[in-house]
Amino acid sequence: MLGPTPELDQTLQAYDYLLPETFIAQTPLVPRDRSRLLVVQQQAHQHKIFQDLVALLQPGDLLVFNDTRVIPARLLGRKLNSELAQPVEVFLLEPRQPNTWLALVRPGRRLKPGAQIEFGPPERPLLRAEILATDADTRGRIIQFESLVEEPFEDLLEQLGEVPLPPYIQESTAQPEQYQTVYAQHPGAVAAPTAGLHFTPELLARLQSEGINQAHLTLHVGIGTFRPVETDDILQHHMHSEWVDLPAATVDAIRTTKASGGRVIAVGTTVTRALEGACQNGPLVPWQGRTNLFIYPSYQWRVVDGLITNFHLPKSSLLMLVSALVGRERLLALYEDAIAQQYRFYSFGDAMLVLPEAVIAERSPDPVF
């Protein structure tokens, strides 16, 4: 077993690896649950198919899912009072108030507070937006939308917007619903919680029939999920924040699972951040708020016992999170084998299951339940 190297674990370069571009999946598999699954055990690892998940978990285990839904966050419009009908791109980041959003706009330098943008056909625009202010933290804009027809903003967004794909997906023929989990419920994300893309309704039903329980929370994945770590010392990295809704039913399910000896398996890094972030200042309770928790090696775990996740970008905070479970050296060795076995990487790629027996990290001594 590879051992921890604490000082090296804090350096950004230690999380680098070489991935040929041909390994970056551009389209999702059909059916979803035919993707490959690298199963991380205590000493060894196995290569399986995602459908095998039923046999790899135990009755009494609890899968926790992120039920956020990706919104059509990219809008193309035109600036009003512009002689040249200047095109404007608006990328919604997060809601601030009803019909009011924080957004990135291009070209931003020409869009000052008071500027207006219209969307839809020029002869019959459907939606209008006004720039209210510049956000000091992101340099984005606070934008208020107004429907120009008898349809709510949410419906117009579905008509006019485009679901954004990650920047490394450039040649995809994927349909918008293929970048949604089958259990997506609450609109608000600008990127999918991709570990959940492998589940089908049939697989969820099989898991339930075998006594593997399911619970949900909501974390609206933000654009910060693609932001690289840029500081040589990762401890100097400022983690982006994301909005979380952890309902009482999920907290109860986690307590019941732990009390009966079951294991909590997070479906994705977003669920991991939400659960661990919710109990940083005390016991796990129902909670709504923002988390900017940065998980890296030496983190002491509180709730999560195991993890289902995709394969992540070099030098990313997500790679550091998974390293906090199994150790950085072992994770990079697993990635090396995945490349040798021609796994597909990133959002539309294959998956990894970190079983609880593979976790080498310490548990927090603080009471959580």
Curated annotation (Swiss-Prot):
SUPFAM superfamilies: QueA-like (SSF111337)
Molecular function GO terms recorded: S-adenosylmethionine:tRNA ribosyltransferase-isomerase activity
UniProt entry keywords in alphabetical sequence: Cytoplasm, Queuosine biosynthesis, S-adenosyl-L-methionine, Transferase
Sections of the chain in a coiled coil: none
Protein EC: 2.4.99.17
Any GO BP: tRNA wobble guanine modification
Catalytic activity: 7-aminomethyl-7-carbaguanosine(34) in tRNA + S-adenosyl-L-methionine = epoxyqueuosine(34) in tRNA + adenine + L-methionine + 2 H(+)
GO terms under cellular component: cytoplasm
Entry keyword annotation includes S-adenosyl-L-methionine: yes
Major location category of this protein: cytoplasm
InterPro entries recorded: QueA, QueA_dom1, QueA_dom2, QueA_sf
Subcellular location: Cytoplasm
Entry similarity comment: Belongs to the QueA family.
Subunit structure: Monomer.
Role this protein plays: Transfers and isomerizes the ribose moiety from AdoMet to the 7-aminomethyl group of 7-deazaguanine (preQ1-tRNA) to give epoxyqueuosine (oQ-tRNA).
HAMAP family given in the database record: QueA
Protein name (database record): S-adenosylmethionine:tRNA ribosyltransferase-isomerase
